[in-house]
Amino acid sequence: MSAETSAFAYANTQILQMLDQHPLPELKAAAEELSQNYRALEFHKSRHPLFHLAYLAVRFPATFDVNHKVLSVIPNPQDITSFLDLGAGPGTASVAAQDTFSDLKEMTLIDSDGQFQKISRTLLESRKTKLNFEQGLIHRLKGPYPADVVSMSYVLGELDEGAQAALIQEAWTWAQKYLSLIEPGTPRGYGRILRAREQLLAKGAYILGPCPHHNGCPLTGNDWCHFSVRLQRQEYHRRLKGVSLGYEDEKYSYLILSKESVTHPKARVIRPPRSLPGRQIFDLCTSNGVLRKTLTKKDGPAFKAAKHLRLGDAWDDDSGS
């Protein structure tokens, strides 16, 4: 394998080879059942025999993009040498970690699903990283499992609140530098992120992102903090979902906590910016609450910079009103 090939590209090739071994109608039936179960929040319902392959086809690309986006927030990626993936599934977060941290030496993946663990071995074998696998329920682990970065990606929603709090505390204990939490970008998903935020701030954690402060979250009621990645659908993805649109948007909420104090931006864009004739309008999360910023041409460089703003970007300029 060439040194230039990304971990994702290698994993995607392996997934395509697995999918090619099964008829499309059977995979489509499995994908539809998977989607129905997730919409109904029935994560543990009886599964189609091709559930694991359907998950790879339907969910792996989007959850990879989210994990890669979130892990890329961590500074000095060359200093990260170990990674713990709790509730690893097929190893999506671990593949993203391989593409994010160039000097990764060791990874530990823990999941209760033996078939997913077999798949993750295949998807991750493109690197010389030492791989450790453990099969078990993540909320009943004995530990310890120390690692520079501990990741829980789309995991908390499968546990009750008591088990969530206990696992978050364990994960924070094992994290040597950072703890990464990702949940669906829904009110329920963000609710889990918010509870983890409150729990670990009380333990002395520092927020790396997305929050630009340690104050209470200013988003209340029907508003919640979430972001989005747009990914291009591959041909097999479109065929399985029966759609023609060439892309999809994956909404997510996240939190990265640090063991060390970090420098925050002044603000973060929390809603898609609007570009109007002669004006740029965007909403910011700040230490003083949510602020709507309006920039015009008279704001010069700040106005030009605002034209390129995206949801989730940091903002440090005081220009505008």
Which residues make up each language-model segment?
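Conserved SAM-binding loop of SAM-dependent methyltransferases across substrates and taxa
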Residues: 90-103
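N-terminal auxiliary segments of SAM/dcSAM-dependent transferases
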Residues: 1-42
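Conserved class I S-adenosyl-L-methionine
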Residues: 79-89
